[in-house]
Amino acid sequence: MPLTRDPFQNPALDKDDSYLGKSRASKKLPYKNPTHLAQQQEPWCRLSSTPTITSMKRDGFFFYSEIPKDDLDFRLAALYNHHTGTFKNKSEILTHQETIQDTRRIKTQFPGEFLPAPQPPLITSRANIRHWINPKKESIHSIQGSIVSPHTAATNGGYSRKNDGGFFST
């Protein structure tokens, strides 16, 4: 084995231009304005000056009393129509008012400042909604009208087996 050979030889790193022979000219034209001037023109000025909902919520003075506190509040605040929303996935069901409404006119509430109350959403006529009230108060401990199963909870200390069989657990 010759002494001049490198046992850990790495491939030589060459640029793309060395394989082609001569360098190619760039097809991309340089920008007309420098960056700091281009950001003051449309549409960049409008995009950078208009706050998003997320950036408004990060503001220290932002106050919104109806912010969901946990997953249950998040789901209850979501808009869901049981008639048209059947078998939709989670991302389609959990749609909030902020996603649908125009949020360009949301104003940040500063301390000591009182904003006018938002207009309530349009409510359909409640005359067509029927509400049934049971005239007889049912006991929650009664087994009358319960779901039929091979076990009954009427015994003390656990479940007992019915006459028709089935397994039980204690």
Swiss-Prot record:
User: How is expression of this protein distributed across tissues?
Assistant: Expressed in trachea multiciliated cells.
**Which UniProt keyword terms apply here?**
Cell projection, Cilium, Cytoplasm, Cytoskeleton, Flagellum
A Pfam family reported for this protein in Swiss-Prot or TrEMBL: DUF3695
Q: Name one GO cellular component term.
A: sperm flagellum
**Localization per Swiss-Prot or TrEMBL:** Cytoplasm, Cytoskeleton, Cilium axoneme; Cytoplasm, Cytoskeleton, Flagellum axoneme; Cytoplasm; Cytoplasm, Cytoskeleton
Quick one: a GO biological-process term for this protein? flagellated sperm motility
Q: Where is this region: Disordered?
A: 1-37, 151-170
Q: Principal localization? A: cytoplasm
What does the record note on quaternary structure? Microtubule inner protein component of sperm flagellar doublet microtubules.
Function per UniProt: Microtubule inner protein (MIP) part of the dynein-decorated doublet microtubules (DMTs) in cilia axoneme, which is required for motile cilia beating. May play an important role for the maintenance of myelin-axon integrity. May affect intracellular Ca(2+) homeostasis.
What is this protein called in UniProt?
A: Cilia- and flagella-associated protein 276
Gene this chain is encoded by: CFAP276
